[in-house]
């Protein structure tokens, strides 16, 4: 019996070491990865005056439950973006990954004057139009590791993530202040009544 406990503990320790080593290697690879360079090049090439923007990798995951009766289904949808930002101005370039190849679409522009409201919650930034209808939600995180087909990049972007957080805070204050929004919850509720 004691041998089984010792073997079990040893297996857990070995598994922990393997996972830790993999995470550490992925983080080191992501600090100056090919994917990070591609994101910066995409921003430079497709965003007007792209070199004047901070470039980052952004994602959005949407998890939903559905079904009825005895059947419950879960759906997770993923979006990937090259994010370009500077004070008062945001571009999102949709990305797609197919068999390791990175492709991109036309950039979407969101200037502070185009937005009706911005909400920040738990690291997510949600943009709303002038009628306070949700446009989209995204987040930029410091560590992205290639875990599976739904997490396809190794990109470490601590400085960019911190800069995006400051940008998002500033954009929220500017946009909400310009549109007379002091209570986001009340503004959302009023928009639903329309």
Model-identified regions with their sequence ranges:
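Terminal and domain-flanking low-complexity segments
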Residues: 131-134, 141-194
């Amino acid at each position: 019996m004691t041998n089984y406990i010792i073997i079990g503990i040893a297996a857990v320790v070995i598994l922990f070491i393997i996972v830790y080593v993999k995470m550490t290697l992925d983080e080191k690879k992501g600090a100056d990865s090919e994917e990070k360079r591609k994101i910066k090049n995409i921003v430079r090439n497709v965003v007007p005056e792209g070199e004047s923007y901070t470039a980052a990798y952004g994602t959005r995951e949407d998890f939903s439950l559905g079904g009825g009766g005895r059947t419950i289904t879960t759906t997770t949808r993923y979006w990937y973006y090259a994010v370009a930002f500077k004070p008062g101005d945001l571009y999102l370039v949709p990305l797609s990954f197919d068999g390791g190849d990175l492709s991109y679409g036309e950039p979407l522009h969101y200037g502070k004057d185009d937005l009706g409201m911005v909400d920040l919650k738990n690291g997510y930034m949600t943009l709303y139009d002038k009628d306070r209808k949700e446009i989209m939600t995204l987040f930029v995180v410091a560590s992205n590791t290639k875990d599976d087909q739904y997490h396809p990049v190794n990109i470490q972007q601590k400085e960019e993530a911190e800069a995006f957080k400051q940008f998002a805070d500033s954009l929220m204050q500017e946009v909400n202040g310009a549109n007379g929004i002091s209570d986001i919850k009340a503004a959302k509720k009023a928009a639903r009544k329309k």
